């Protein structure tokens, strides 16, 4: 395991930021049902921001074509809540520059991405997210490896019913 980052601390910071932003979004859109929440990153997992989707947003302007495409979702809260995450990821980068990693994917990328996924999973298990809220962690310009991580995350984070809806959507629009 890498000595560059405390993955438990990262997961905790992500959980706190997600819980705060999701709660704020629920308050802001209290007359509307939140249907999706996603964490977006890059292939080096050096950035992290969130997006969300509501029933009203989905039905306005016929956004059904992007229902399961978080990079197209139009809602978010202030990313200031992710400042601690950004600081930790930036510190990782400084240390990372000083070392060469033979197993970069296994030591850096995968566990960082996994910390993001586990944060959402724990919040789902704690009841922060209702069962009908689609959750995802994804790269905004993904390599094949990141697509595999996203797919595994979707399976871990969502019910069979949501995955079936996602697969139907993907067959139609993906």
Residue ranges and their predicted role:
Residues 1-34:
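Short N-terminal edge-element motif at the start of the domain
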Residues 8, 12, 90, 99, ...:
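Polar/charged alpha-helical tracts
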Residues 10-21, 106-119:
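Well-ordered, non-membrane alpha-helical segments in soluble/globular domains
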Residues 25-65:
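N-terminal interaction modules that seed assembly of large macromolecular complexes
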Residues 26-30, 124-129:
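Surface-exposed acidic, glycine-flexible loop patches that form ligand/cofactor-binding
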Residues 58-113:
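Polybasic, proline/glycine-rich intrinsically disordered low-complexity segments
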Residues 125-174:
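Glycine-rich, aromatic-bearing surface loops/beta-hairpins
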């Amino acid at each position: 395991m890498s000595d560059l980052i405390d993955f438990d601390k990262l997961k905790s910071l992500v959980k706190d930021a997600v819980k705060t932003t999701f709660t704020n979004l629920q308050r802001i859109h209290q007359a509307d049902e939140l249907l999706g929440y996603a964490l977006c990153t890059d292939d080096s997992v050096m950035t992290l921001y969130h997006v969300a989707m509501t029933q009203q947003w989905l039905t306005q302007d016929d956004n059904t074509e992007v229902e399961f495409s978080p990079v197209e979702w139009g809602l978010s809260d202030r990313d200031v809540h992710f400042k601690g995450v950004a600081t930790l990821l930036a510190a990782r980068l400084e240390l990372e520059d000083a070392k060469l990693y033979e197993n970069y994917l296994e030591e850096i990328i995968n566990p960082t991405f996994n910390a993001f996924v586990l944060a959402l999973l724990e919040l789902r298990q704690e009841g922060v997210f209702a069962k009908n809220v689609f959750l995802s962690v994804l790269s905004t310009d993904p390599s094949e490896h990141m697509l595999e991580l996203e797919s595994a995350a979707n399976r871990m984070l969502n019910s069979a019913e949501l995955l079936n809806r996602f697969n139907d959507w993907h067959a139609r629009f993906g």
